[in-house]
Curated annotation (Swiss-Prot):
SUPFAM superfamilies: RNA-binding domain, RBD. The gene is Cpsf6. Its main location: nucleus. GO terms for molecular function: mRNA binding. Belongs to the RRM CPSF6/7 family. The lineage of its organism: Eukaryota, Metazoa, Ecdysozoa, Arthropoda, Hexapoda. GO terms for biological process: mRNA alternative polyadenylation; regulation of alternative mRNA splicing, via spliceosome. This is Cleavage and polyadenylation specificity factor subunit 6. Residues 529-538 have a biased composition (Basic residues). Residues 391-406, 598-610 have a biased composition (Low complexity). Keywords: mRNA processing, Nucleus, Phosphoprotein, RNA-binding. It comes from Drosophila melanogaster.
Amino acid sequence: MADVVLDLYAEDLDKDFAGQAQDEFGGDGVDLYDDIGGPTESAASGGGGGGTPSADGAAGPGSGEPGERNSGGPNGVYHQSSGSLTPTMNRRYQLYVGNLTWWTTDQDIANSLRDIGVSDLQEVKFFENRANGQSKGFSVISLGSESSLRAVLDQLPKKEMHGQAPVVTYPSKQALTQFESLQKTRPVPPPQQNGPPRGPAPPSMGGGPMPTGHPGGPQGGGPPGHPPRGMNSIMQPGQYRPQHMSQVPQVGGPNSGPPRMQPPMHPQGGLMGNQQPPPRYPSAQGQWPGQRPGGPRPGPPNGPPQRPMFQGGPMGMPVRGPAGPDWRRPPMHGGFPPQGPPRGLPPAPGPGGPHGAPAPHVNPAFFNQPGGPAQHPGMGGPPHGAPGPQPGMNMPPQQGMNMTPQHGPPPQFAQHGPRGPWPPPQGKPPGPFPDPQQMGPQLTEVEFEEVMSRNRTVSSSAIARAVSDAAAGEYSSAIETLVTAISLIKQSKVAHDERCKILISSLQDTLHGIEAKSYNRRERSRSRERSHRSRQRRERSTSRYRERSRERERDRDRERERDGGSYRERSRSRERERQAPDHYRDDSRSVRPRKSPEPVVAEAAEAPSSKRYYEDRERYRSSDRERRDRDRDRDRERERDRDRREEHRSRH
């Protein structure tokens, strides 16, 4: 698009830009423009500005052109209605309100509008993250009249909401893209910002077309209402693109002065003096997303306030642009060369541009990409890549620069809700950004060698002492010495060096060897203890066996003695039993008469003897049975005692 001449008053201007919309905005990670289908409005000269179709928000007429709301899309896509400037019945006046905290509600906006005298607010729609539903910090409002639109443009930036001054702009795709990029970017400035600017000063603002992405200046020759394309890589992340450049008519050649020149604005004093600083953005209560609190101050702007400048533009060269209705805003630092009027500014940064830190109302879990270099503080811009004001926006009043916001979310907004812990409104933003104070200064060669020699001494002495302690059997002392030396070397300033890593590895090898030796010694001592215990067990078992054998022998002897005594008693009883009949027989013979007695007398004499025999025999048997029972009980008791003694010995 750099070498294409555009007809500013063509009705089919959208055909020229239809093929460029996806190329320009599709790579920014913003997929909210798929439903854009409405034709763009023809740009008007003078006070009427031509808007571009916007997505996810509202149509952007330069002077409150009506926009028709389409309910399609996740956030509600707004299309611009083509037509003339004549009012219609369905006419809606819409504006973007940005730089809001994530906890700002539609009621807060309604109250602020009521305070400035606007009572015909129709709708407030916030832009939210699709992943967690959190507010992105900007919204689109619909008003009922053009007078209310003008009042909001002029007075709402002076009205703070939750400690931040809102930014009001006409709805356009460029403003929407800028709001989206500001809540996605997070620049991380290096510790020292003393480098030169990143490009030469642009030779002229009104010349012919320049190559796409040239770092020295913008492309000239584009229409006033549409900035040149293909310059996403040369714009600072925190800078806005002007929205309504059609209010600056082009008169004269490239080197001629701009028409309708206004007197320059007078400076209001430097930041270091006692006077008020020049009105610039961002404010103290509402820092722009991307500015980190506590950063370095910019250089004192001793010259007159200046307009937004390009990357690498010169300092101290103000631009006296027209002061139309869209230019009623405070100046900012940085500027263009005064050779010609600003005929076009580059668009917002593309996907390759530097990224910035999230604002307090942005969830940082979605934006962890590393940041690029920020703007030089001496170039006049806000520190750490903070954006300058956009010419299509009304800026807040004069406020300080380096104060952190002292406002937080109200109690009803739980910062640890179901959508994750939100970041606090002030302080250092979370993320994998190293602290410059923790990085440490670079060591000189002399300091490096001194630290390395100290580490070598520590390593050699630790190894020698550990080896001597290990040889003496003091393994715990040797291990402690090596561990201490390893920790000391790792904490030194040159621990990342390869030579230092070699020292650490040698110490670790020595430590592993000593630990292995200490483990082997413990195992040997344990094995000796085990062998001693097993020997004791064997001796104990042999002694038990001997005792048991002796007890068995004693038991056998007792049994033999018992058996011998019982046998003798039995033999005696048998002898008595044999002798008893003979005795009875002899008695009977001596008593018996010569005559054979009568049978009755004989039976009476024999009956007592036989009865006595059986009684004696029964008595002997019972006594023998009792004796055997006693011996059996005694043997059982002896066996029980023996078992008890065995159990007691086995336990001990």
